[in-house]
Amino acid sequence: MSSAGDSGPGYVLNDFDAVPRLSYARSIDIRDSLSDLIRIQRDSYDAFIGIDEGSSGGIQSIFQSMFPIRDPLGRAVLEFVSCNIGEPQYDEYECIKRGITFSVPMRITLRFVVWKVQEVSFKEVKYVVDEGTLERSVKYMKEQEVSIGDLPMMTSYGTFIINGIERVIVSQMHRSPGVFFDSDKGKTYSSGKLIYSARIIPYRGSWLDFEFDIKDIIYFRIDKKRKLPVTYLLKALGMSNNDILDTFYDKVLYVRSDKGWKVPFVVDRFKGVRLSYDLMDVDGNVLIKANTRITLRIAKKLYADGLREYLVPFAGISGLFVATDLVDPASGAVIVSAGEAIAAEHIVKLELFDISEIAFLNIDFLTVGPYVLNTLFLDRHITQEDALFEIYRVLRSGESPNLEAVKSFFKGLFFEPDRYDLSVVGRIKLNSHLRLDIDENLTVLTKDDIVHVIKKLVLLPDGEGVVDDIDHLGNRRVRSVGEFIENQFRVGILRLERMIMDYMSSVNFDNAVPCDFVNPKILATVLKDFFSSSQLSQFMDQTNPLSEVTHKRRLSALGPGGLTRERAGFEVRDVHPTHYGRICPIETPEGQNIGLISSLAIYAKINKYGFIESPYRKVIDGVVTDSVEYLLATQESDYYIADAGAALDENNRFVDDMLYCRHGGNFVMVKREDVNYIDVSPKQIVSVAASLIPFLENNDANRALMGSNMQRQAVPLLKAEAPLVGTGMESVVAAGSGAVVLAKRDGVVHRVDGSYIVIRAFDKNKDEYLGVDIYKLRKFQRSNHNTCINQRPIVKIGDYVRTNDVIADGAAIDRGELALGKNVLVAFMSWQGYNFEDSIVISSDVVKRDVFTSIHIEEFECVVRDTPLGPEKIMRSVPDVNEESLSHLDDVGIVNIGAEVSAGSVLVGKVTPRPPVSLPPETKLLVTIFGEKVFDCVDSSLYLPPDVEGTVIDVHVFVRRGVEENDRSLLIKQSEVNSFRKERDYEIDVVSEYFYDELKKLLCSADLPLNGHADVESLLAAKSLEALWEIGLSNPKISAKVADMKGKFDELITEAHSKFDQKIDKLNYGYDLPQGVLTIVKVFVAVKHNLQPGDKMAGRHGNKGVISRIVPVEDMPHLEDGTPVDIILNSLGVPSRMNIGQILETHLGWAAVNLGHRVGRMLDSGEEEGPVVESIRSFLSEVYEGQKLKEDVASMSDEALLKFANRLRRGVPMAAPVFEGPKDAQISRLLELADVDPSGQVDLYDGRSGQKFDRKVTVGYIYMLKLHHLVDDKIHARSVGPYGLVTQQPLGGKSHFGGQRFGEMECWALQAYGAAYTLQEMLTVKSDDIVGRVRIYESIIKGDSNFECGIPESFNVMVKELRSLCLDVVLKQDKEFTSSKVE
């Protein structure tokens, strides 16, 4: 596809290309990263299937982890050999049409080996099994391929089709497995003391928490159960008291001398210490007096002066904790136990027993606290067995197991892969957090892990280390579709494994084969439950292409294993610095899900571990390189990263010496040589939807959020129109959405019609036949949200297309660009108060021209069942229905395509058998006299609902296999056969044309007898392909080549016929319908929605409103030349909302249209072509000043330039990228070029009076969207409808054909006005007085205006409620009064 980038001599814009935009982008985009917007879905699923080379995941690895399964008695083993994933039976469109799941059959090859128990001969096969060196011989071995069900397959658009409905699996943001350190921020205790905790979160298994209490004792919890001292856990791991002390504390050796205890001088231990004694060297010289605080500088100076040991007075060891037991050398009695503090009496004993050296624990209460020691001394005499039993009692209270069971249970908690899994991510996080070097594949906890977590935890109160930020994206990862399905797959496989083992323990192995052990429904049921009912498996938002893309890129913190909206606090919802370039800070819902559901930033991608990466360009010595690197949030904090808007010179070097950079979550000013990276684009922080808002930087964030969300609600219009003022992202979103048809490879368009595009693959460097691509377009299909999906070809025969060129537009697409709305002429002013409170005034001309008209497709289904009284039937002669109502049905009883239907129309005539009824004698006489037919069935036809009116555009009839088909279904089947035949003939035509040309070339080069013709070409001119084959094969010089060509030709023709036959076979196979269903008829009705008061409209800047009035075009304000404005917006809606972007868009749109008008005037000037071309070239060069397009315009031929200029008549398309929009001066320059007032304001005239308004008005072109909140879908009035079973009051809501609630406050209003009779009617006969309802109906029929009100049913319900509370409530009539009362 030619584009602005394809500059060069003779630049030509293809007809199917969008007009290049005048772009104000100042940075260079990396478009490669935007080529696949739904890669997050596709890559994840491919990894699960195992498509990626070197992938550790995949279905194969799941089966390998489950098998082999051994018989509990060791008699047999079931082994996994291989897995085979088949091809889908039906394509995506056929699955939607049939209402089935798009899936592939999955089969595994299993080997069942049965061992012999008796002695074996040497000739038999030997197997060495796990039990030592024991050899067993095989009794018999059977290998078999077994079906294990169907696997739902992802479509090419990143969706799943489940029961005919497209669904999306939303990715989930959850806390990454690993260890996290946190504090209560002083909120737990009134003292404000920080309480620190640590938590080890696995991917699967029990959570392990460590926490301090107010007394600085360390406890642990398993799965948030009752807490125990952490030393119980350490002892359960096999550590003794001495092991615990040795692990958590350093030892300091005190050596006895004549003057005191000699201690090694370590600088770090004296930092901030206040001496309680004189600091002396070993010779007794006082270096520092007591009560002096030693700073780190003083300590370093002492060490530099040669101090290596110092003296501690004999009494100075009081209060220190001994590291090992101090034992009397003579008696062996323990003087001081390990961990105990030295007391005054101990010092005397130490002198008596002449102990020469003592090892003390390095606890100084300043940098090292006695937390573990204090915890140990809570109960230091507890044994390993006691600790194990205590842990067991906490988790399994009420049970009394033996020691082996307790050990096994404890081991299974954290140390067995079957019950505990950190995952590779969790192991990596643990290793990096704790500075460990443990193999990534070891995904269970180790003793070292637990010890190091406690070690790091005890450093926090001492001021070392920092707590983790749980909202940091280094601590949150994304679980995508592949991971969810893999987890469900494992659940299903575990159930299957248990079933196989149960079956093995009871079955006779003599005749068993692998298929006996496998029930394919188990896995299929688990997967079906997930896709049908999981919170993250969602009905795809298919309102427009943008809503599809956004839904697939959505990130949710909700769902299984995630947060709940009720408990999620402000912190987790808030924007975090690490979201930069990873998660959009703008796009999120406005309701209670705000911040919990977000969208992936436009350039972000997810690595194999589930962490979000953002791209940056590498900077070396102040020069920006083209190298792009993706960084994690944890890596990013170490670098200085400049903003994409930083000024660069022609050598890509920073112009400024100092730049603002992001570093560690803050903005700092650094030298340009210190900068490590630069953003790839200013728009990398926003999502796809936000990147489509021009002048986003000029809008308030709240309005930008609304603008992003409302673009997803825009309904595709009858004629799509790309925005004049865009952002340059429109084509990217269109191509990435799947709404357009992209060319699979280079080729030439061979044939085009409304339903097919046929392209012959073509490569200038290859001569051989490369094949044909046939694209079947989606015509008037219904989307999930009832909008119309219709693809239109934009190429013509003979066009050369390249790979990924747009060859057909879809819904809301205009020449490959996203087109959600329309460019309309807007005036910001008030008009008779009709634009009060954001209301919108629309010109009737807009409605007349179908500018905002949209087509919606409604689907109605009629099910024909087999009843106990006989089958229901589709027929035209429906009892008690007049012929006029059946006029649009065919002979079968199904509505004709093209029929105009309205509320109450019969779509499908159907009757249901009913039990025979005995007729009264008078009825029998009438039947006999008049010969009337007595129907033994009742009308159960499909009628059009009250609020629908439209045209029938399609009918599908599905007849159960084995049931006779009706004429209509045969007709539909024949049309499908014709469609398949058409595809086959297209392919054969392309093949025949190619080989005809090639054979002709070959024959022309051969020496053929002319037989009277002037030359070879005239000889071959009228010959058919068959005749040319005969000529070529009869010529001995070229017969070998011709035979080779004929072989290839025949092979391709046979292949085309084979594909056709396969499609016919599938069609003739019939339909598998649910039990008891004979036929299903689906009728599709196209409904045309014109713009009308009550419809909701919006711009892209959060400027939404409801249409208040459609004004006749002659009454609308108009420009000086008589052009009426299309839409009037309230100017008071701008200042308070602070979305100034709409005003700037209006000005730029005004300039764009008037530039186009000026080009049009030049084209229509009537001058000679030469001067016109040069004036246009000169003018466009001025318009595109400073753009690459200026060179393209200069290189165009005259013909190409005129063609290009004609495409600009309606306006010059502009691109104002996010954060790079044009400045005021640039907009003013364009307005001047367009010959309009640079202020963007013009004189307007009142259409009713013709008078000019007092002040100039801001007028321009703005892009407006029609949202799917249509008044036709909301407005509703009840006449007669259903009543509630208990209260007998009318139901509520349009879907239940309900009434308007007359509530408590409305009753007050009637009471205030004293309207007693009206109030009585409202509360009785118009609501739930059953008897009164009947009586008033009878009165109306008789023409009598009198009626009586009875007792409301709600009163009876209240009486029943009171009686259920054992209160006997009786109504009595008082003789003196006419009113009733309750006693």
Swiss-Prot record:
Keywords: DNA-directed RNA polymerase, Nucleotidyltransferase, Transcription, Transferase. CDD domains: RNA_pol_B_RPB2. Gene3D superfamilies: 2.40.50.100, 2.40.50.150, 3.90.1100.10, DNA-directed RNA polymerase, beta subunit, external 1 domain, DNA-directed RNA polymerase, subunit 2, domain 6, RNA polymerase alpha subunit dimerisation domain, RNA polymerase Rpb2, domain 2. One of its GO terms (cellular component) is DNA-directed RNA polymerase complex. GO terms for biological process: DNA-templated transcription. Its EC number is 2.7.7.6. The keyword Transcription applies. It catalyses: RNA(n) + a ribonucleoside 5'-triphosphate = RNA(n+1) + diphosphate. NCBIfam families: PRK00405.1 (NF001616), rpoB (TIGR02013). This is DNA-directed RNA polymerase subunit beta. It comes from Anaplasma phagocytophilum (strain HZ). The lineage of its organism: Bacteria, Pseudomonadati, Pseudomonadota, Alphaproteobacteria, Rickettsiales. The gene is rpoB.
